[in-house]
Amino acid sequence: DDRDINKHMGEPSHPHVPWSKTVIYELHVKGFTANAPWLPPELRGTYAGLAHPATLSYLQDLGVTSIELLPIQAKQSELFLQERNRTNYWGYSTLGYFAPEASYATKQAQEAGAGAVRQEVIDMVRAMHEAGFEVIMDVVYNHTCESGPEGPTICWRGLDNLSYYRRTKDKISRLYDTTGCGNTLDFTNTHVTTFAVDSLRYWAKRIGIDGFRFDLAATLARLDGEFTRYHPFLYALRSDLLLGNLKMIMEPWDCGPNGWRTGQFGIPFAEWNDRFRDCTRTFWLTDVERARGGETGDMTMQSMATRLCGSADLFATDPGRGSTASVNYVACHDGFTTADLTQYRHKHNEANGENNRDGSDNNHSVNFGHEGPCSDPIITQQRERAIMNMLGTLLLSLGTPMLLAGDEFGNSQNGNNNAYTQDNETTWLDWDWLYSTEQTAELKLFNLTSRLIALRKARY
């Protein structure tokens, strides 16, 4: 039994950034460096590429403190994607909860075997720690890659189908799905909770991870179908001597009834604040557009002030819980990038092969008179100003800011707001601007973002 606090907390290499100083940066291991010209080809899109000194130097220049990695646990794409020769690029289709995703390792490590892949991940985490960064993992314990009844039998379905997956009360053969992914792990069963906690402890203690972001966390806290902050799984996280001292961030919703639970998880959990996201977008985008047309906007100054001051209506309801529990963001992997919020009024997900039915239609986005890229100087100026306003609001508000990788230089996904299948140039960051001899718009925005982060650090 290795359940002690000393292994992780006693290692001086862990930065242990206070919540009040934390600036989170969400990135995809492959997409961040797949096009990185500073890396040799064999390191691009890999754990080793992310750990390269030049990569870390860029992140240091930006000023963020905590790197949140999209899922890096071993994954398997859903059958319907495989049949279309597509992959689940984001990785929210976990196959192995104790194993890193091998495809993000260098070819040399993959050929050497699982041990070499694991070591490459450990080396990446250590390099980030030495550079001053915390490493937070996005983890998916709400469902598995086995999907619904039509999905494959790979592991849990074959081991103990009735125990691992939640069932409807009226028909035990029917899966109860609150994730939108075909199945839901049943955290009312003790062995499921134990399995998840052991997995988290492995990543924290053996790999060196500093925190976790829990996908669709409302699902993890349902008893008899209803959300409760007193769920045994949440209690297990709070009370564990190792995990209870790490950063734990909840995505406080799921697809089930009464699934939106922002602000309700309590201490010690932080939560993604969708109210901040929607308020900031509305205030600087759709309301500005309405005002120009002589209409009244949706967002009052009082509502905006509440978000600027830490969303006390959501996160000051428990004694000792403050604004840092609010993870503020304007954009994340799931949705438009910040730049695309100013270029596209409508989603453009045709490349996903689902006839543009996938992805949210509720984006609070505008296009300033032209859908997509535009060379008109007035429209360009309006878009740049809106981006700066949103990033300024994000980085200077009370709470814990989270920046989407690429937003600091105006990255676009060409209007795709659900790029989960796009393992290509759509999601791979374009770094050409770094090597331009001119004062590009990307460089200007990067410099502004880094100054805002520096100002935040000096203030808080």
Go through each PLM region and give its residues:
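Catalytic cores of secreted or luminal carbohydrate-active enzymes
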Residues: 434-460
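The feature marks proteins involved in alpha-glucan
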Residues: 1-28, 33-45
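Hydrophobic faces of well-ordered beta-strands that scaffold small-molecule active sites
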Residues: 23-25, 67-69, 135-137, 212, ...
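Short, flexible loop/turn elements at secondary-structure junctions
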Residues: 28-33, 54, 73, 96, ...
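Conserved alpha/beta catalytic core and glycan-binding cleft of carbohydrate-active enzymes
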Residues: 229-405, 409-410, 418-422, 460
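Acyl/amide activation-and-transfer machinery of modular secondary-metabolite enzymes
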Residues: 420-431
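Substrate-binding/active-site clefts of carbohydrate-active enzymes
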Residues: 30-208, 216-242, 247
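Active-site rim elements
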Residues: 9-14, 186-189, 220-224, 317, ...
